[in-house]
Design a protein with these regions (language model features):
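Signature for the C-terminal beta-barrel architecture of outer-membrane proteins
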Residues: 1-4, 12-19, 23-27, 31-175
Length: 175
């Protein structure tokens, strides 16, 4: 459900800007791109650097209501956070982004047997590069990778030998 009255604060002091309340931030088109969330975020821009971070509730829980049989609209409460670190100088730059989101398994007390909803877990990493070709043409390229677990309640885990060792502590990966 989308509230009609959205409260947010965006205080700024020198090179720091905060976002508090129901807010949105953008890291890149392939990672975090204007998603509304309830929480907080910071942007720090010292010189040629741009550092951003956020954390909060990405999705509200929608419980099952038998009277209206809302199986299709049920949702787990989803929490997430992320960081973006970028550097740019004279038209050249690089940005690294890391995001994590996970459904809270205990947020739904009743799930009908006919429901297909499962709690998910995801981590996204991205690297964006920016450069100039000549004096008037610039180019930006971004590579983003997502490691989505569609059902964190499965007990059978994937083979750790085929799973990235740097990602496995961060995501509950399964088949």
């Amino acid at each position: 459900t989308q509230p009609f009255n959205i409260t947010a604060l965006h205080p700024t002091y020198k090179k720091v800007k905060a976002h508090v309340g129901i807010v949105s931030m953008s890291f890149s088109p392939y990672t975090l791109a204007g998603l509304n969330f309830a929480g907080g975020g910071l942007e720090y821009t010292p010189g040629k650097w741009k550092i951003q971070g956020f954390g909060g509730r990405l999705k509200k829980q929608v419980a099952f209501i038998p009277e209206i049989n809302n199986i299709e609209t049920m949702a787990y409460r989803r929490w997430g956070g992320g960081i973006s670190i970028g550097y740019e100088d004279k038209g050249y730059g690089a940005t690294f982004i890391l995001l994590k989101a996970a459904d809270q398994r205990t947020s739904l007390s009743t799930i009908p047997n006919s429901a297909t909803i499962t709690p998910m877990d995801n981590i996204v990493a991205s690297l964006a590069l920016k450069g100039k070709i000549g004096k008037s043409v610039s180019m930006t390229a971004e590579y983003a990778s997502s490691n989505l677990s569609r059902n964190t309640e499965l007990t059978e885990q994937i083979d750790r030998k085929t799973y990235a060792k740097t990602v496995s502590p961060l995501v509950n990966g399964n088949q």
